[in-house]
């Protein structure tokens, strides 16, 4: 398999980390949509030129991290999958991850507005909208924080909830300016610190 994308994307990172946790043989090729020569190559696997994209061993191109993770779960089987295949716990986990994904998407939007690689001129930024997105990021993460059930998010063992939320939280913390409302997520921060000691996480931390 071949994973396309940069670990600077929290969505690419969660796929890369999952591949390592599943011990699935793969090649990681760094392709970034904001680099013109890499953009054209990326379009071969995703017409939207978004990351991540996964090329399976039989040549199928999968796009969107949700689709890719579902494929990997089915590949390793229900006994090894980090997401339950059925039941209420699956629904709870996917809902929780969905909140986290929404929070990091708001953070990504803020990054494009006023981050290092901002796309919009400073005088064209609509401050009330950006401030609202920072607030939504905070509210989303703190909602997930309130759902933590043990040493890992869902209880006593690591699941896809931890993989995804660690990748999401790390991106948010790295790119959140000091002027934004302070996050209050001690349990998620503790889980992130613990997870990032594992080689499967530490080897996907972006530079």
Feature-to-residue mapping (PLM):
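Short, contiguous strand/loop micro-motifs
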Residues: 1-3, 128, 178-179, 203
């Amino acid at each position: 398999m071949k994973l396309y994308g940069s670990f600077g994307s929290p969505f690419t990172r969660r796929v890369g980390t999952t591949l390592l946790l599943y011990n699935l043989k793969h090649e990681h090729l760094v392709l970034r949509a904001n680099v013109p020569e890499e953009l054209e190559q990326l379009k071969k696997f995703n017409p939207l030129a978004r990351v991540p994209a996964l090329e399976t061993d039989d040549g199928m191109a999968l796009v969107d991290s949700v689709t890719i993770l579902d494929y990997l779960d089915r590949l390793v089987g229900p006994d090894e999958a980090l997401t339950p295949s059925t039941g209420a716990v699956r629904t709870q986990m996917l809902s929780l991850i969905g909140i986290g994904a929404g929070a990091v998407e708001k953070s990504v939007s803020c990054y494009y507005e006023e981050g290092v690689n901002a796309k919009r001129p400073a005088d064209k930024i609509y401050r009330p909208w950006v401030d609202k997105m920072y607030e939504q990021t905070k509210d989303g993460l703190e909602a997930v924080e309130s759902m933590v059930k043990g040493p890992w998010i869902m209880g006593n063992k690591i699941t896809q909830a931890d993989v995804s939320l660690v990748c999401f939280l790390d991106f948010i913390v790295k790119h959140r300016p000091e002027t934004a409302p302070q996050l209050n997520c001690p349990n998620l921060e503790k889980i992130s610190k613990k997870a990032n000691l594992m080689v499967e996480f530490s080897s996907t931390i972006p530079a």
